[in-house]
Amino acid sequence: MWSNDHTERFPWQVPVAEGGTKEFAHLPYAVLHYVVVSNELNSPKILTCPQDPNRIRTNVWDAPLHVSLSYFAGLNADETNPDTILAGDRNVSTSSSTVTGLLTVQNARDLQATKDIHKTFVHVALVDGSAAQLNPADLRKAAAVEMKALTNQPMRLVIP
């Protein structure tokens, strides 16, 4: 949707002057990347996972979305690599605790699902339009596939 209108690029790949968030991709604010696609979404309610106990669901766009957002943005997502992760539940980390901000994963084996939302799994949306529920082993496999597709670059996620 949004990427179709921006030459197959996602917000973090498009300069601010063209309606994207590229200059902010290094910042720890996932909400910035979702706000720019708000015209493509019917309601901000879909930005909150119903099972996320630490987020407040809202029906209005002028509410503070940082307290509602349940999903990370996958900064490596790229239309030319359909196996890259576009978004997912925020309960991913390289430790046993949920983190916020920019998470850089150097080794796929370090990525794990925390127990804060879905106990032992994470929902992800891939660039190819598919979605998956991944257990920790499958999450690490998906990360390894993404990192290999991107010539072994670290995986970068902005977690709300």
What do the PLM-derived regions correspond to, one by one?
Residues 30-34, 63-76, 109-111, 158-160:
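A Trp-anchored, charged/polar loop motif used as the substrate-binding/catalytic surface
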Residues 25-33, 114, 121:
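Soluble or luminal CAZymes and related metallo-dependent hydrolases
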Residues 1-31, 43-46, 131, 135, ...:
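Conserved hydrophobic/amphipathic alpha-helical signal-anchor segments
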Residues 94-160:
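C-terminal accessory segments of extracellular proteins
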Residues 41-106:
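Acidic, glycine-rich loop-and-strand cores that form catalytic or ligand-binding grooves
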Residues 35-41:
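Helix-loop "lid/cap" segments that line or gate small-molecule binding pockets
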Residues 33, 45, 81, 118-120, ...:
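Residues that flank catalytic or metal-binding motifs in active/ligand-binding sites
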